[in-house]
UniProtKB/Swiss-Prot annotation:
Functions as a PqqA binding protein and presents PqqA to PqqE, in the pyrroloquinoline quinone (PQQ) biosynthetic pathway. This is PqqA binding protein. The keyword Cell inner membrane does not apply. Monomer. Interacts with PqqE. One of its GO terms (molecular function) is quinone binding. It comes from Xanthomonas oryzae pv. oryzae (strain PXO99A). It holds the Pfam family PqqD. Pathway: Cofactor biosynthesis; pyrroloquinoline quinone biosynthesis. HAMAP family: PQQ_syn_PqqD (MF_00655). One of its GO terms (biological process) is pyrroloquinoline quinone biosynthetic process.
Amino acid sequence: MSSITRDGQPALRAGVRLQYDRARDQWVLLAPERVVELDEIALVVAQRYDGTRSLAQIAQELAAEFDADAADIEADVIELTATLQQKRLLRL
């Protein structure tokens, strides 16, 4: 498994998609034979996993959008990314 860095450009793995689940009334990541529920924060991060933006860029966008500390946001983005990568939902 590769190390997560602020320069990583995550994208959802093939077969994984972001979808609103009406039964659960929330956004989820759908993967073969599993569903990962996303809270509001995880959703705004996951929506930016496009394979072109670095984690640092994602954090800067979110810090500007929510008027929050960029370093705190970056740490949270990296932590979420590491968790989703461990679940084999992302490629870097």
